[in-house]
From Swiss-Prot:
Organism of provenance: Amolops loloensis
Keywords: Amidation, Amphibian defense peptide, Antibiotic, Antimicrobial, Cleavage on pair of basic residues, Fungicide, Immunity, Innate immunity, Secreted, Signal
Leucine amide: residues bearing it: 62
Sequence similarity: Belongs to the frog skin active peptide (FSAP) family. Temporin subfamily.
Protein localization: Secreted
Domain of life: Eukaryota
Protein name per Swiss-Prot or TrEMBL: Temporin-ALf
Record function comment: Antimicrobial peptide with activity against Gram-positive and Gram-negative bacteria and against fungi. Has been tested against S.aureus (MIC=2.5 ug/mL), B.pumilus (MIC=5.0 ug/mL), B.cereus (MIC=30.0 ug/mL), E.coli (MIC=2.5 ug/mL), B.dysenteriae (MIC=5.0 ug/mL), A.cacoaceticus (MIC=30.0 ug/mL), P.aeruginosa (MIC=5.0 ug/mL) and C.albicans (MIC=2.5 ug/mL). Also shows a weak hemolytic activity.
């Protein structure tokens, strides 16, 4: 029983460290993304697929 508790405690400890490292990495990425160039690239990535779908839908309607 004692070995089971030790191994569970070790897994919990390692999982906590892993989550902490992931959170730090995510925060660093968010800080880098706050730069204006990155925000513009993000908007372009979201904007162009929507425009493409609209244009293809309109061309399909006009082609009929």
């Amino acid at each position: 029983m004692f070995t089971l508790k030790k191994s569970l405690l070790l897994l919990f400890f390692l999982g906590t460290i892993n989550l902490s490292l992931c959170e730090q990495e995510r925060n660093a990425e968010e800080e880098r993304r706050d730069e204006p160039d990155e925000r513009n690239a993000e908007v372009e990535k979201r904007f162009f697929p929507i425009v493409g779908k609209l244009l293809s839908g309109l061309s399909g309607l006009l082609g009929k």
